[in-house]
């Protein structure tokens, strides 16, 4: 590495640290740590074990954020010192390069920590795909997205399960529900919520005309035991049915599939992945809790935006991304303007660039 390149990297790293400092509010962070530490010394702190564990985890996260930032500051100062010494002792260059690599790795990890800092970013995720109007073409597009997200999840090391699968009449799917289990699953996948638009020559059109199709994607965090969602038994209607996998695989001879309808809201969820009716009901209840909680959060967001006079529409139906197969190839996110030409790679699950751009855009928007 040339000295000029080293000097440039040191400048860029300092700029990143300055940006992190602005977004962190270190004084506020210290105050919050002190408050939580005082709270943990109270005599009745461990009376509510679940709440105590949550507070303890929150404190550990804040401490880690604070300490890591100061470690990076020290490492940054160290690289500057090495640079000054390099003019008199070239043998120190290797140590300088090692310190730079170490700092850049920590900076990259830290940036992702800041980007995934919203309340449920670390939770598992539930993702639903529903084709819009357009028959077989739209249902095939939904199936393509199903494949894309499955490949993405597997590449990330998530445990991906198909909770419910409704096959299309001729091809594709009518709906599918997936669960993604792993660190930051919801934090990564929340960027995918909205309507996805496809433009291509339809393989189902004998005239080979260009078609535009739409599919909606819903993403919810799977809630843990610290979040309570009150659901009355009287408000739930349960139906059972014979369940089977994609394409009619492993069809059960008994009714193990469970469909729950929340009567007050009309929300419907279903699970077919488990071999028992009890297991599927448990999974369906988790999905229903997540949907009802998400609905409540949307209502609160709408109230806040009404007070602010925010004109932005907060709906599942806002078009977020276009996938163009013809007359050229391009995938473009309409929120961040991030785009790539390699549509095949995107359909193979390579959506990290879109997720990264969304998280940075969202952090700036907040």
UniProtKB/Swiss-Prot annotation:
Q: Where in the cell is it found?
A: Cytoplasm
PANTHER family linked to this entry: CLASS I PEPTIDE CHAIN RELEASE FACTOR, PEPTIDE CHAIN RELEASE FACTOR 2
Among SMART domains, the record links this protein to: PCRF (SM00937)
List-wise, which residues carry N5-methylglutamine?
A: 249
- Name this polypeptide is given: Peptide chain release factor 2
PTM comment for this protein?
Answer: Methylated by PrmC. Methylation increases the termination efficiency of RF2.
Which NCBIfam families would you find in this protein's record?
prfB
Q: Which GO terms describe its molecular function?
A: translation release factor activity, codon specific
The record's section on SUPFAM superfamilies has:
Release factor
Gene name in the database record: prfB
InterPro entries recorded for this chain? PCRF (IPR005139), Pep_chain_release_fac_I (IPR000352), Pep_chain_release_fac_I_sf (IPR045853), PrfB (IPR004374)
Function description: Peptide chain release factor 2 directs the termination of translation in response to the peptide chain termination codons UGA and UAA.
Family as reported in the entry's similarity comment: Belongs to the prokaryotic/mitochondrial release factor family.
- Mind naming one GO cellular-component term on file for this protein? cytoplasm
Q: Which UniProt keywords apply?
A: Cytoplasm, Methylation, Protein biosynthesis
């Amino acid at each position: 590495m040339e000295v000029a390149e080293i000097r440039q990297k040191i400048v860029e790293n300092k700029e990143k640290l300055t940006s992190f400092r602005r977004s962190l509010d270190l004084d506020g962070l210290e105050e919050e740590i002190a408050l939580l530490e005082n709270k943990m010394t109270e005599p009745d702190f461990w009376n509510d074990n679940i709440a105590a564990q949550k507070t303890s985890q929150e404190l550990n996260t804040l401490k880690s954020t604070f300490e890591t930032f100061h470690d990076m500051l020290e490492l940054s100062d160290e690289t500057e010192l090495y640079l000054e010494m390099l003019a008199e002792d070239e043998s120190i260059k290797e140590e300088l390069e090692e310190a730079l690599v170490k700092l850049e790795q920590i900076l990259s990890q830290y940036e992702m920590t800041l980007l995934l800092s919203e309340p449920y970013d670390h939770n598992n995720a539930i993702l639903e795909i529903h084709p819009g109007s357009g028959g077989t073409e739209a249902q095939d597009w939904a199936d393509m997205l199903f494949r894309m997200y499955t490949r993405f999840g597997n590449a990330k090391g998530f445990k991906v399960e198909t909770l419910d699968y409704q096959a299309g009449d001729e091809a594709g799917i009518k709906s599918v529900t997936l669960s993604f289990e792993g660190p930051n699953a919801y934090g990564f996948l929340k960027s995918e919520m909205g309507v996805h638009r496809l433009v291509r020559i339809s393989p189902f059109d004998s005239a080979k005309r260009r078609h535009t199709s739409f599919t909606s994607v819903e993403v919810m965090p799977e809630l843990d035991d610290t979040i309570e969602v009150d659901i009355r038994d009287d408000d739930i209607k349960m139906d059972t049915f014979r369940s089977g996998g994609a394409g009619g695989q492993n069809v059960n001879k008994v009714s193990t599939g469970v469909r729950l309808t929340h009567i007050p809201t009309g929300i419907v969820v279903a699970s077919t992945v488990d071999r028992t009716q009890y297991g599927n009901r448990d999974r369906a209840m988790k999905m229903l809790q997540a949907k009802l909680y998400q609905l409540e959060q949307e209502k609160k967001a709408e109230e806040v935006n009404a007070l602010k006079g925010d004109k932005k529409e907060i709906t599942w139906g806002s078009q977020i991304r276009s996938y163009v197969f013809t007359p050229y190839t391009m995938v473009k996110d309409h929120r961040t303007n991030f785009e790539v030409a390699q549509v095949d790679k995107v359909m193979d699950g390579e959506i990290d660039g879109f997720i990264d751009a969304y998280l940075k855009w969202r952090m700036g928007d907040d």
